[in-house]
């Protein structure tokens, strides 16, 4: 459903942010 799609999108964004912060600058 729509809510599920939004949740997936937010989860993906969150994962990307966590990955970026985990990478050495």
Curated annotation (Swiss-Prot):
<comment type="similarity">
    <text>Belongs to the frog skin active peptide (FSAP) family. Caerin subfamily.</text>
</comment>
<dbReference type="GO" id="GO:0005186">
    <property type="term" value="F:pheromone activity"/>
</dbReference>
<dbReference type="GO" id="GO:0005576">
    <property type="term" value="C:extracellular region"/>
</dbReference>
<keyword id="KW-0878">Amphibian defense peptide</keyword>
<dbReference type="Pfam" id="PF16049">
    <property type="entry name" value="Antimicrobial24"/>
</dbReference>
<dbReference type="GO" id="GO:0006952">
    <property type="term" value="P:defense response"/>
</dbReference>
<keyword id="KW-0964">Secreted</keyword>
<keyword id="KW-0588">Pheromone</keyword>
<dbReference type="InterPro" id="IPR032021">
    <property type="entry name" value="Frog_Litoria"/>
</dbReference>
<comment type="function">
    <text>Acts as a male sex pheromone that attracts females. Has no antimicrobial activity.</text>
</comment>
<protein>
    <recommendedName>
        <fullName>Caerin-2.3</fullName>
    </recommendedName>
</protein>
